[in-house]
Amino acid sequence: MAMGLMCGRRELLRLLQSGRRVHSVAGPSQWLGKPLTTRLLFPAAPCCCRPHYLFLAASGPRSLSTSAISFAEVQVQAPPVVAATPSPTAVPEVASGETADVVQTAAEQSFAELGLGSYTPVGLIQNLLEFMHVDLGLPWWGAIAACTVFARCLIFPLIVTGQREAARIHNHLPEIQKFSSRIREAKLAGDHIEYYKASSEMALYQKKHGIKLYKPLILPVTQAPIFISFFIALREMANLPVPSLQTGGLWWFQDLTVSDPIYILPLAVTATMWAVLELGAETGVQSSDLQWMRNVIRMMPLITLPITMHFPTAVFMYWLSSNLFSLVQVSCLRIPAVRTVLKIPQRVVHDLDKLPPREGFLESFKKGWKNAEMTRQLREREQRMRNQLELAARGPLRQTFTHNPLLQPGKDNPPNIPSSSSKPKSKYPWHDTLG
């Protein structure tokens, strides 16, 4: 027996040194009632007839001991469970400029947060600009130009109507100018009968040929609210300012919230506006048709330049886009095929002898000033006559002659009628008149 124990002890030490271990962990049924136990099975010495096995139990998480005792404690530790790391998702490659735009768009505040945009005409324009910039991805200068073209396309039917009426007026211009000359001369002469007669004949002539002089002015009257709404919308965005508007420009005008530093845009807008008005792109009436309109047109761009040169660049971007669109539009409407499709009458070339002679700018200005002065004097004279008639209707009759109309010159006075010379002169002679 002692020999078997000695052999078993030597075998235990040999197994512990060589690291040969046999683990038998208690099953789950034993976890509820007993703590986790590690069981070791060691073969006995081979000197015996049959092998003996030593069953060692180690209770508790303690390390095995190599002391002279017959029990070894083994610590059992489960390996930590490491979750599988997911593979990183593929990130699309973006250029540096596009990355900056994406980051700026993501960080940009909406117009509602900035206090812009509403259901007014100005707010609707701001909402349209925001849609084109944020949703469509256009830069601010492109969004302003695209919004301008969209607005001008909406009023294109009015442009065609104005062109039709302008062509009709031009074809009947000699007769219209004759009636206008008769009316003006009758008014200056104070001949009311001739004035109303010429006015009536001119109205009948216009009705017969379907001429309406106010129709060419419908387009400027309609476009004025659109221009004012765009101006206010862009001015509010620049004065706030919208952060992205400060870097949404082009070329030398990167900041759309300030005025043009080298004044190229104001000069370009002035030149294009003069061309638009001179060619009649907005009204359809060329400046050579009406003398007074030509003179006013030539002065307007120069008058507005000192006032508009300090506007924000965003306003000039809209203005320049609108003027360029008008020039392209009038160029297309001069094509005969386009005029035929749109049913615009062809312009008749009149004989210069049938038209009144053209005057220079100074002569026309002096003549207009003289006509205005004469019109004012006639108006004052009519007002004085009206006041005298009203006074005569309310008060007593007043003497309007220097002698007695009852006395005939060259004849003696009747005997029963006393001479007027025998009577003392009254201080108020009109009191003695018949009434």
From Swiss-Prot:
Residue numbers on the Mitochondrial matrix membrane side: 135-139, 234-260, 321-435
Listed InterPro entries: YidC/ALB3/OXA1/COX18, YidC/Oxa/ALB_C
A cellular component term, taken from the record's GO annotations: mitochondrial inner membrane
Compartments (UniProt record): Mitochondrion inner membrane
GO BP of this protein: aerobic respiration; mitochondrial protein quality control; mitochondrial proton-transporting ATP synthase complex assembly; mitochondrial respiratory chain complex I assembly; mitochondrial translation; negative regulation of ATP-dependent activity; negative regulation of oxidoreductase activity; protein insertion into mitochondrial inner membrane from matrix
Topological domains, Mitochondrial intermembrane: 1-113, 161-212, 282-299
Modification Phosphothreonine occurs at: T400, T402
Impact upon substituting C147F: Found in patient with a fatal childhood-onset mitochondrial encephalopathy, hypotonia and developmental delay; uncertain significance; cells show impaired assembly of the complexes I, IV and V
Modified residues (Phosphoserine): S364
UniProt region (Disordered), positions on chain: 400-435
CDD domains documented for this protein: 5TM_Oxa1-like
Membrane-topology descriptor: Multi-pass membrane protein
Alphabetized GO MF terms: membrane insertase activity; mitochondrial ribosome binding; protein homodimerization activity
Alphabetized UniProt keyword annotations: Membrane, Mitochondrion, Mitochondrion inner membrane, Phosphoprotein, Transit peptide, Transmembrane, Transmembrane helix
Pfam families assigned to the protein according to its UniProt record, in alphabetical order: 60KD_IMP (PF02096)
Sequence intervals crossing the membrane: 114-134, 140-160, 213-233, 261-281, 300-320
Presence of the UniProt keyword Transferase in the record: no
Function (record text): Mitochondrial membrane insertase that mediates the cotranslational insertion of integral membrane proteins into the mitochondrial inner membrane. Essential for the activity and assembly of cytochrome oxidase. Required for the correct biogenesis of ATP synthase and complex I in mitochondria.
Family statement: Belongs to the OXA1/ALB3/YidC family.
PANTHER family in UniProt: MITOCHONDRIAL INNER MEMBRANE PROTEIN OXA1L, OXA1
Subunit structure: Monomer; predominantly monomeric at low salt concentrations. Homooligomer; predominantly homooligomeric at high salt concentrations. Associates with the mitochondrial ribosome. Associates preferentially as a dimer with the large ribosomal subunit 39S of the mitochondrial ribosome. Interacts with OXA1L; promoting cotranslational quality control in mitochondria.
Descriptive protein name: Mitochondrial inner membrane protein OXA1L
UniProt organism field: Homo sapiens (Human)
